[in-house]
Amino acid sequence: MANTVIVGTQWGDEGKGKIVDMLAEQAGAIVRFQGGNNAGHTLVVEGEQCILHLIPSGVLHQGKKCLIGNGVVLDPEVFLKEIDGLAEKGVDVSPERLMISKKTQIIMPYHKLMDNCRESLKSADNKIGTTGRGIGPCYEDKMNRCGIRAADLADPELLREKIVAGLQEKNVLFEKLFNVEALDAEKVYQEMLPIAERVKPYLADVSSIIQDVNKEGKDVLFEGAQGVHLDIDHGTYPFVTSSNVVSGNAAAGAGCGPRQLERIIGICKAYTTRVGAGPFPTELFDETGDTLQKNGHEFGATTGRKRRCGWLDMVVLRETARLCDLTEFALTKLDVLSGLKEIEICVAYEYRGEKVDYPPQEQNGMAHVKPVYESMPGWDEDITKASSYDELPEAARNYIARIEELSGVKVGIVSVGPDRAQTIVR
């Protein structure tokens, strides 16, 4: 299979979990390299749904190592809740196969409080649409070099020291700026101790494990979260997440060299969705948008929020292909387009009187573009039982071919339904 990176090509929710679950069979290890539990990866195996927020999507494949890299921010309570839920289903979640990098940053209670306090102060027009799970404040502490790392959970005195230091500044903000009660450092520490005890067995040197897996002749699957256009640097800033989502961060966020990243698959929904605030050039506000939302079951796996829906945006995909050096696309939810008489594809933007093929670089530039559309005939056939590319309707194959022409990237995988088996590999 080769060491493979999975990235979302749009604004998240592209169906990465399903593709990771499918490819995990061929991998020796699956590693999450960025983000936190602000992402929800939904797996459906033989009709049974499983939603994961932190644990790699390959966990349902027994015997595969599942790793959480140093680029992730981990909420230990969510982690423990997930392993307990998986254990109830009979899934092996022992420390022998599930491991957390000792360098992973830990989301603390005060990060979540800070996240919600900040969002509450913003006007309706300035809200980012954060999930309120403490992701941003945790990354902020990491950059300020005062964060709590997973290894600190095994050192009670250092843990207490860091909690006390961390709350000195934050409590001033809570009381003076946000008008909420300050947190008691000792209470936070005492509440963390039993959690730390349960997490400690899972701590490991993830970087070395990745090297060992490759030395054994096995491949590693790098699982990204969110989407490239939520990337802190390359996304629709400031309506972005707090980490680098691009494929290049797989090396830094997992602890390996860039030459170990051999195959880069961009997961692409057959239309476009976005959760929360931020520019969305191809968003639909009509009956077609409602149809996509309904037929695609477009509700966030993490927040339950209704997703905004629109036509496929090739400007967005072209930019992702450039930023991530994609080797192929995995096209998901193609079945949702069945029944549409006509399908629109955004092939370019009009921006400041010019036609552009890539997103503008200026802040909020995407809010001022006009999509240039190309129409293609749709298809009526139910494609959910198609098991080969040739079984797809001609119009569906033409749609895929046009995506390849406009992006210069091959569509190597086509998903025609939520179940693992409803996947066509070309």
Swiss-Prot record:
Binds 1 Mg(2+) ion per subunit. The lineage of its organism: Bacteria, Pseudomonadati, Thermodesulfobacteriota, Desulfovibrionia, Desulfovibrionales. GO terms for cellular component: cytoplasm. This is Adenylosuccinate synthetase. It comes from the Bacteria. Substrate binds at residues 301-307. It catalyses: IMP + L-aspartate + GTP = N(6)-(1,2-dicarboxyethyl)-AMP + GDP + phosphate + 2 H(+). Mg(2+) binds at residues 13, 40. It comes from Maridesulfovibrio salexigens (strain ATCC 14822 / DSM 2638 / NCIMB 8403 / VKM B-1763). HAMAP family: Adenylosucc_synth. The keyword Nucleus does not apply. GO terms for molecular function: adenylosuccinate synthase activity; GTP binding; magnesium ion binding. Its EC number is 6.3.4.4. Pathway: Purine metabolism; AMP biosynthesis via de novo pathway; AMP from IMP: step 1/2. Homodimer. IMP binds at residues 13-16, 38-41, 131, 145, 226, 241, 305. Its main location: cytoplasm. Plays an important role in the de novo pathway of purine nucleotide biosynthesis. Catalyzes the first committed step in the biosynthesis of AMP from IMP. The active site is at 13 (proton acceptor), 41 (proton donor). GTP binds at residues 12-18, 40-42, 307, 333-335, 415-417. Keywords: Cytoplasm, GTP-binding, Ligase, Magnesium, Metal-binding, Nucleotide-binding, Purine biosynthesis. It is found in: Cytoplasm. Belongs to the adenylosuccinate synthetase family. One of its GO terms (biological process) is IMP metabolic process. Its cofactor is Mg(2+).
